[in-house]
Amino acid sequence: MVQRSDWYVRLFSLDVCMEVFVASGRHLFTSESVSSGHPDKMADQISDGVLDALLREHPKSRVACETLVTTGLALLSGEITSEAKDVDYVNLTRNIIRDIGYVDDAMGFNCDTCDVKIFLDPQSQDIGNAVDDNPEEGKSTGAGDQGLMFGFACNETGEFMPLPIALAHRIVNRLTEVRQQGEAPWLWPDGKSQVTVQYQNGRPEKIHTVVVSNQHSPEVTQDAIKAFVLK
């Protein structure tokens, strides 16, 4: 079996990626998914909410919004170019946090009492000069940021995602569903799941390990949590 250190080194080279999967024989692969109340996911949803609100009013808005979330604080910063005038960033942020489920100080975060700081400035005019529509050419001339991404689809699941991450997503999505439906009122918004799948010659062979971690109210017992999650 390929050693884990060798596994990670070889994955950086795309031309041997499939060779590693096929030649490594039996190996374990773990993926993690976090719920909507995890700080990283909260920050993503707030930044997405800012973008959506601006695009609804001005479809040509350019938004570079970063969000930091920590206990009792949501901080938004970045640069924005938009003709939208009616976006209330503070209330928008509080409503997103409320929808996630943070409505009680006991959870360590409360949509109504948390501090929301806004540091959103106009985008540099130098960037605007480079990317705004050019009337002489009748088209846009560039982008304000650049990125190079790659990925692939696989046939392990119906959503064309690798089995470990697909299963981890399903678990945290189900936890969120039962919490929002009131089936488990002791569940709080922050949670995560890790799923380890054993592969044989590049194909899923069996589920090796499942880890589920979730915030909860202090009165619920560990035995009750375990029985509920297993069910």
Q: Can you name each region flagged by the protein language model?
A:
Residues R4:
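Cationic, low-complexity basic patches in intrinsically disordered or flexible, solvent-exposed regions
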Residues L11-L14:
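Leucine-biased recognition of intrinsically disordered, low-complexity hydrophobic segments
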Residues E19-A64:
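N-terminal, positively charged regions that mediate nucleic acid binding
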Residues T30, N91, I96-K231:
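Glycine-rich, mobile lid/loop segments that gate access to catalytic sites or pores
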Residues K60-T70, S193-G202:
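Short edge beta-strands and adjacent turn/loop segments
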Residues A64-S82:
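Short, charge-patterned binding micro-sites
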Residues I80-T93:
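Short, structured active-site "lid" loops
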